[in-house]
Amino acid sequence: MARSPDPKGSGGLSQRQLRVGEQVRHALAQVLQRGEIRDDLIAHTVISVSEVRMSPDLKIATCFITPLGNADTQAVIKALAANAKFIRGRMAPSLSQMKYMPEFRFRADTSFDNFSKIDALLRSPEVARDLGHDDEEDREADKASRNGDE
């Protein structure tokens, strides 16, 4: 029996994948915050873990990270990948309820870049003019519907 499409648009992830992904994200953030990784680049960089997507069998965790500050994203990803087994071992106690510890894959989180592009587009004069025009039309339609109700 096939699953019905997810109406919330979560990318087809199951509730279990979402829950476990959030637990892994929290545990990874704790390991990074405590500074347990002995790598100069990671130790001197604040790293934001925005999302962790679990594979359907929960054996692969794709971690989306953003280094804050002037750190080179690709260099941070390489450093995290080089320390993935150490990170996995440090996270094991806090994820002891899992049957298997997942393999970690690190990716750059580009959602912040996408948000800033959309924000810049919305602030552009052309879009602001169009949005202002739509607002005037909406106000006129609201007035017309109110006058019709009376």
From Swiss-Prot:
Residues in the signal sequence: none
Description of how the protein assembles with itself and partners: Monomer. Binds 30S ribosomal subunits, but not 50S ribosomal subunits or 70S ribosomes.
Entry keywords, A to Z: Cytoplasm, Ribosome biogenesis
Protein name: Ribosome-binding factor A
Chain intervals for the UniProt region annotation (Disordered): 128-150
Family statement drawn from the similarity comment of this UniProt entry: Belongs to the RbfA family.
Single GO biological process annotation from the record: maturation of SSU-rRNA
Chief subcellular location: cytoplasm
CC per GO annotation: cytosol
Job description of the protein: One of several proteins that assist in the late maturation steps of the functional core of the 30S ribosomal subunit. Associates with free 30S ribosomal subunits (but not with 30S subunits that are part of 70S ribosomes or polysomes). Required for efficient processing of 16S rRNA. May interact with the 5'-terminal helix region of 16S rRNA.
Compositionally biased residues, Basic and acidic residues: 140-150
GO molecular function: ribosomal small subunit binding
Stored SUPFAM superfamilies: Ribosome-binding factor A, RbfA
Subcellular location: Cytoplasm
